[in-house]
Amino acid sequence: MTLRAFLSGLGLSVLATMAQAEGWTVSDLGSLDTREECMRRAEATIDSYRAVYGGSGFTGRSEWTIGGYDLRGDVVDALIICPIEAGLAAPFLIVFNSDSDNDARGLVAERLEEIWDQQLAGDGAVPSETK
């Protein structure tokens, strides 16, 4: 199975799930030169999120994904996926919740994107918590 076929299938699966329960937020995080750089930034993003906003969950890792689990209680999780497309890492973020609090899911997604963007800008600063 090619990466493109896998991602297409994943996209269809996410769209089908979105139609059933609006518990998903998917964000394109741009592109990076290597998967290694993508994975490093993904892990740093999840670690920075926990440092600022808390969350007693765990971080799962595979060859090309980083999962931040229990980012808001045990109902909001996030995956940063680092596939290779046309020779570049093409990361995207999926945040999902298992309850009906879609606003909380959206807030977690925004915070993760902000941290990711700050890393790409070379800022290195961790955002301060805002309510």
Region spans (language model):
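Bacterial N-terminal signal peptides that target proteins for export
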Residues: 1-10
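Ser/Thr-rich, low-complexity intrinsically disordered terminal regions
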Residues: 22-27, 31, 35-125, 129-130
